[in-house]
Each structure stands twice: as structure tokens, then as C-alpha cells.
Amino acid sequence: MNNSYLMGLDFGTLSGRAVIVRASDGAEMGTAVHEYPHGVMDRTLSAADGRKLPPDFALQDPADYLGTLEVIVHKAVEDAGVDPGRGLDVTSATVVAATRNGTPLCQLPEFRNEPHAWVKLWKHHGAQDQADRIVKLAQERREPWLARYGGILSSEMLMPK
């Protein structure tokens, strides 16, 4: 019998994880976990000049994602001993500012020490003032779309960030 296998990838807050399962029955064949080298930068911009960050910031280095991807894919495949298919899951509230060609701004020398050029994690709440301003203006204008969000916007959403 010819088996098919699937690989699932999850990029969490502190680490990336991979799992390989047999498609026919979901049996786990191999796994891997790798912690991000720079972790979460919530006090200082430790991957750059070390400057102190404002309250409620939660940033990451996008290079950690690529390095982690390489590690966990190879380790999971080795652990399972199979050639997998691949699937990807990411958190929609994590934002990466990038150039037209996809280069994250924090990887450009002129933006390396700019906190807003780094990946803003789902738990980055540094945009609360902007979220409040957007809601206030939407209420004043009686914007119909605001009701779809329960009359509020989270600072974790793309628009305030």
C-alpha cells in the first residue's frame, strides 16, 4: 500500500513546530520544535541596537521564521523518515511591513533600528490609541462596518497597527 503523508507547520509566539501525519489515519509520524533565536522583543529591540521599546510592544525578527522553518522541516522529515506534503498556518494578527518584493523593512539597513519596521506580533498592543481613534471617528460618522466588529476594534488588528 502506498501511504501519503502531510506536514503541518505552526509558527507560534515563541517557537515554530512541525508535525508529519499519515493521511489515511492521522497517525503522527514525526515532529520538531525550534525556539526563535530572538524570541519576543517586548522590552528592547535586542535584534538591532537594543533601544528601549514603548509599553505594550511585542515584536519579532522575521529572519527567525525562515531559520526556524528550515530547521523544523528537516528535523520532522528526518524524524518521520518520509517525503511529506506541506501546509501552513499563521496568525492573521501578526503583521510584517515589507517592500514590494517582500523584503521585511527591518532587514533594510536604514530601518534596522526602527521598532515599527519589525514584525508586530498578535499580542502587540502598542496601537491601542490608534484603535480608539478609529472607533471614535467611525462612531461619529455612524460607519455601518463598525457593528461587524461589535462596535470596537482591537489593537491587535491590522488597521490600528
Predicted regions and their residues:
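Glycine-rich phosphate-binding/catalytic subdomain of phosphoryl-transfer
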Residues: L45-A48, P54-K161
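Alpha-helix termini
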Residues: A23-D25, G39, H74, L137
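Gly/Thr-rich phosphate-binding beta-strand-loop-beta motif of the actin/hexokinase/Hsp70
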Residues: N2-T31, E35, G85-A98
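Intrinsically disordered, low-complexity regions
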Residues: R17, V40, G151-I152
